[in-house]
Amino acid sequence: AKMSGPLRGIHVNAWTTATDWTLRRARPALVKSLDWSPDWARAIREYDIRVFIIRKWADDDSSLVPSPAAAAERLWRRFAADFGRMQAALADTPATVYLETPWNEVHQETPDQLARLAEANVRFVELAHTAGWKALVGNFSVTWPLVDHFPAFVPALAVADGYSHHEYWMPGQLLPGEWTARAGLLYATLPADCPRPPVYVTECGIDNVAGTRPPNQYGWRSYPRPDAAYVVELDAFAASQPPSVAGLTVFNCGEVGTRWKSFELAESGPVADWLAAGPREWEDESGHEMPPAEEVPVSKT
């Protein structure tokens, strides 16, 4: 029987020997990468990567001034050459490729602020589509955006090819609806005629969500438990996802420095084998009818 549920994948900060180990052992169906190596074209074929998501690190320039649309255009100009090189490298690969909008975990406290971020996402997606890319919008942090505010993001969902956000939890505390499995709650707030594109959880795993330890330093390896215990939690996490979730990428592979060392997936046979055992294709059983996508022009450059 064909396996159901979201694709299982990895989040890659940098392509290191550690990343190589995980790619070889896990052969993940899904990869999100911040590393723009043209070698991804080879890896997609060699490891049978079905969906490839790529994002430019732009946390140093996330301001929406002088306007959201102008901010999107500024970031597009900044990275246009890299976008073009990567697009050329990936042109003949069999994977579905998404460009994720560059704003990372931007907290929007009010519906008006979220609407401004939606406006920026809309403009970025327009530029991506014109250049021949599919695009994901969102890239929100765990617990964000607030469920009641989510309808303000409708304009971005209406143009996007997918929606992304991050979900973390603490050992034994998935807290579905609060820390994890939020896509169903978010989508339930939307008008009936609003597009509900496939959801990708583009960062996930055990972390210090509750803030009881120093931030950003307590991944799954920080807890004195066997790797198999993490696999049990990853399994429960994947199984709890609503049918609109197409895939999830576990944080993290490849790190320069030590900040994210406790999240590193390399050298964990149990975790790699769990990734390898996941479905190779996602079947949309959400019941959300996506309107026919407009023909996306292919860039001639």
Please place each PLM-identified region on the residue numbering.
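Aromatic- and acid-rich polysaccharide-binding/catalytic face
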Residues: 33-34, 50-64, 98, 148-183, ...
